[in-house]
Each structure stands twice: as C-alpha cells, then as structure tokens.
C-alpha cells in the first residue's frame, strides 16, 4: 500500500536506501519527520548537507575529520605511540578501538578491503597512503603495523596482501587475535573482546 502523497513516498524511498532500513521502518521515519516542527526538520536537513560538504579524510590516517581540522585530532594528539599503526577498514572501527581505552597508537583507515568479485583492488583502498606513512621524512619510524580488519574472506585477503607487501620493509606486521566471530564487524564487538583480541595479537 502506498501513500497518496508523492512527497511522502519519495521520502520513504530515500530512507529505504539506507543500510538496514526496510520499507516499514522507512515509513515510520517519514511519519516522524512529517510530525516534527519545521525548525527541527531544517536542522536535520542541514546536518545531512554538512556531512557531505564539511567532512573530509584526514591527509595522514584517512579517518574522517572536518575541514579545518586536518590532520585529525588523533593524529595530532600528544602522547600517542607513533611507532605503531592499527590498520582498520572503516572509521567506525576506529571508534570501536577508542572505546576500549587500551590502544594508544595511531590508525590507518583503508575505507574498504580487497574484493576481486566486486572489482575492488589494492588501488581502490588506502594501501598507497599507508605505504607512504612507513617512510616518513621526519618523525619516529613505524615499527609495528597491527592488522585489525573484519574476519571475512575479503578482510583476510587484504591482510595477506599488505603483509607480503611490507615484508621487505622490515616492519613487524601483527594481526589481532581470534575470538572475534568469523564474519563479524568490529564496530559491533564489545570492548572487552576487542581489548583481548588486541592484547593477544600475533605476528604474521
């Protein structure tokens, strides 16, 4: 059953394009928006536009940051161990590790994994940017790279590719420990499990 309002149907269709949102949920969201005050809806619309216009990738770690805050707050933070880089798939994974309060190194966000079936190769993710960080002109040398990608076939493929690429550079490459279910996404793993996986990492 479709609404008689084309505007409502259009909004439902847009909400339904979001991951994990079916038509019923999209309908509820559209009805919620319809009954909100105009100023609240305008704030919501403004926030959506700001995300596209003001958010960029940090030029160092490729994590998300705002225009005018590049490098990002983590890359600029004092007290971080700059000899260790944790390689993750998405910005959400950075948040997951930060919530543990255990990791004090830096990060590198790939924004994807190697997936030949989807036409995604090494040049389509942040591998080139990662390599450029391992031979800095100044500052401390990176001694360890922690591979913390989701335990999927594509994630494992990416881990193997990067570890082989870095072997000649003399950088120790480690991988977070098992204990995270195969196919799970790191952003949904609880802090205690993630901390244990980080502490129990092993060399590749």
Swiss-Prot record:
Stored Pfam families: RecR_C, RecR_HhH, Toprim_4
GO biological process, one term: DNA recombination
ZnF segments: C4-type: 58-75
Gene3D superfamilies, sorted: 3.40.1360.10, 6.10.250.240, RecR Domain 1
UniProt entry keywords in alphabetical sequence: DNA damage, DNA recombination, DNA repair, Metal-binding, Zinc, Zinc-finger
Keyword Metal-binding carried by entry: yes
An annotated Gene Ontology molecular function: DNA binding
Domain annotation Toprim: ranges: 83-181
The keyword Lyase belongs to this UniProt entry's keyword annotation: no
UniProt-listed HAMAP family: RecR
Family stated for the protein in its record: Belongs to the RecR family.
Function as written in the Swiss-Prot or TrEMBL entry: May play a role in DNA repair. It seems to be involved in an RecBC-independent recombinational process of DNA repair. It may act with RecF and RecO.
Protein's name in the database: Recombination protein RecR
Gene: recR
């Amino acid at each position: 059953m479709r609404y008689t309002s084309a505007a409502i149907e259009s909004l439902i269709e847009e909400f339904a394009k979001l991951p994990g949102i079916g038509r019923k949920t999209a309908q509820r969201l559209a009805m919620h928006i319809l009954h909100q005050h105009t100023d609240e809806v305008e704030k919501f619309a403004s926030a959506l536009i700001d995300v596209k216009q003001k958010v960029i990738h940090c030029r160092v770690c490729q994590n998300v940051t705002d225009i005018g805050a590049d490098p990002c707050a983590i890359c600029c933070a004092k007290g971080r161990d700059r000899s260790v880089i944790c390689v993750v798939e998405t910005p959400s994974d950075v948040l997951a590790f930060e919530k543990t309060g255990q990791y004090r190194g830096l990060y590198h966000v790939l924004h994807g994994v190697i997936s030949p079936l989807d036409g995604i190769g090494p040049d389509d993710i942040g591998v080139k940017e990662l390599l450029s960080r391992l031979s800095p002109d100044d500052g401390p040398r990176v001694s360890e790279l922690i591979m913390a990608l989701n335990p999927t076939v594509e994630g494992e493929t990416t881990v193997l590719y990067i570890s082989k690429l870095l072997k000649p550079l003399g950088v120790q490459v480690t991988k977070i420990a098992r204990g995270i279910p195969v196919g799970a996404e790191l952003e949904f793993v609880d802090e205690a499990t993630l901390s244990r996986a980080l502490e129990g990492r092993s060399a590749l």
